[in-house]
Amino acid sequence: MGLQALTIEAIAARAGVGKQTIYRWWASKTDVLLDAFVDDALSGIDPQDSGNLEKDLRRHLTNLSKFLTQSDAGAVFKALIGQAQNDPQLAEKIRVRFTASQRQADCLPIVKAIERGDLPRKTDVDAIVDSLVGPIYYRVLVSGAPLTPAFIKSIVEHFLASIKT
Amino acid sequence: MGLQALTIEAIAARAGVGKQTIYRWWASKTDVLLDAFVDDALSGIDPQDSGNLEKDLRRHLTNLSKFLTQSDAGAVFKALIGQAQNDPQLAEKIRVRFTASQRQADCLPIVKAIERGDLPRKTDVDAIVDSLVGPIYYRVLVSGAPLTPAFIKSIVEHFLASIKT
Amino acid sequence: MGLQALTIEAIAARAGVGKQTIYRWWASKTDVLLDAFVDDALSGIDPQDSGNLEKDLRRHLTNLSKFLTQSDAGAVFKALIGQAQNDPQLAEKIRVRFTASQRQADCLPIVKAIERGDLPRKTDVDAIVDSLVGPIYYRVLVSGAPLTPAFIKSIVEHFLASIKT
Amino acid sequence: MGLQALTIEAIAARAGVGKQTIYRWWASKTDVLLDAFVDDALSGIDPQDSGNLEKDLRRHLTNLSKFLTQSDAGAVFKALIGQAQNDPQLAEKIRVRFTASQRQADCLPIVKAIERGDLPRKTDVDAIVDSLVGPIYYRVLVSGAPLTPAFIKSIVEHFLASIKT
DNA sequence: CGATAATCGAGACGGTACGTCGTGTCTTATC
DNA sequence: GATAAGACACGACGTACCGTCTCGATTATCG
């Protein structure tokens, strides 16, 4: 069931390789996955910027939703994040290798909006981005509720409304 | 490292019990944990209501943060949620046994505010609650960023600002 | 495989009886078998005596052969004797409950012949009987060689020849 | 109590070896014993031949008695033969690996005597050897009666007397 | 004839050993 | 000289039975 169904012996056998060769290059099963996952996952991150904050946010959150729920990489990500709950070292590795880059993309629409002057200079980017992507991750990892366009729309609208004041 | 360091044999030995007795009553290691966890976790949920939405939200989110980061039950919850990423059946069990109740408590401040007339009848409770608790879970499960009072304050203020319009 | 495939739980279940009821009356699995076996095994022993030593011996050894190789009781006997190699107490019980009676029957032709005066008074009955039945048991328990009429004839003839001198 | 007191786990532990290593090389507990037993048991078989049939037979039967009742290998042999009563495959293995060689030694005095001309060419070696060793095995495996020099002497004398005619 | 035991089936219990699987390390034989 | 193949010590798995121990339900005995 999940990661423990994926044995090192099976990986080696499937690769037509001795176990030792695996151990020579990776310290653990999760490291193998992390390496295999990071490359194609990072390539899927979109650095687009249309100049329209609402549009950018909706597109970005939609892409994030699709990554998490529909892509193979997203499935691996969930598996790794799951494993990381029991393994702080893995958690750190995921952050360094993947989450940091993903985070930059998450921040991009906000940062660009600040540069444009659409948002005030003193905006707390971190808190805002967490408020935008947090609900997405929550539904994926915890509640299992579906990520509908309406939900994404609601997140973005609440955010935009909150900064109108 | 986490759940696989907790063997059934150790559980049985520690309980002064034969392995078979564990297997007789629980189908898996996670079921044992789920049973042991649910009782004391649910008891920690607070149904308080002061009549002040902002105050209630901050208190509730603060309690949630403490549960997730500082309590034993929270640690078990993280481990279970982690395992659930590889195991849809476990995910479902967690929702039925625990998340559902937790969710009710999460919704309470909003529901009460609606009853009071502080929020409009047509408020989408689910989307709003996800937006409030989502960022908390995100930091705990994914980013590892700290749950400061300032962060909680920021979440609540953005929400309140968004509904002022 | 043999006796350890016959579990107490299976015996109890097959008899529609609680395990405790078995344990109340028998101390061990072999005791159950011993009881079940002794009755019908003893009833098969023939105390006939025709007055003709050769004829009696051949008939007796033939019967013994059939008992050991063709009857259900013989199969149980082999199983019990097998178990007894590892269990002196069982060995003793088998002797008291069964082998002793069997032995009397084995001795009968010789004893009768002595009474008749066909054999000298000082005949060592035990040694002679062992020499007669020993080869039979040897083939059954050890060598697996078949118990042909010719073999039985050979045993008897050698014995009769040996006492002619 | 015998073989079931000798667990695979104990064998492995005593050998400072993982259980798997045992299972890799032997299919069952009895196979382990058989291998361990055969080597030193075969080495104890004596191919001596003095040219005197009576002397050779007495010496051989005496050695056989000592092997069965006084040596460690004899104890293992009895345990294996016991187990073999419930396990035809084991019975066959014992015959191939051990009994066959033992049998050759058992036959030797008779065969040599025939070569010497002390016994007729048409002698039925198998039947005779069974008659000689059968009583020994019978006392060991079934009756438990002691193997005295007098008993062995009686066996040999009866045999020699029977061929005098 | 109804209360009171004794006996029984059922099966949970603390244990022990089973045979299997996967781990990470070490060795061999091949290319 | 690197590598596939796989043996090795180890430890947890989930299963099967062991012999002991409660449980009701069902009999049988006696008041």
Which positions does each model-derived feature cover?
Chain A
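Hydrophobic alpha-helical connector segments
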Residues: 45-77
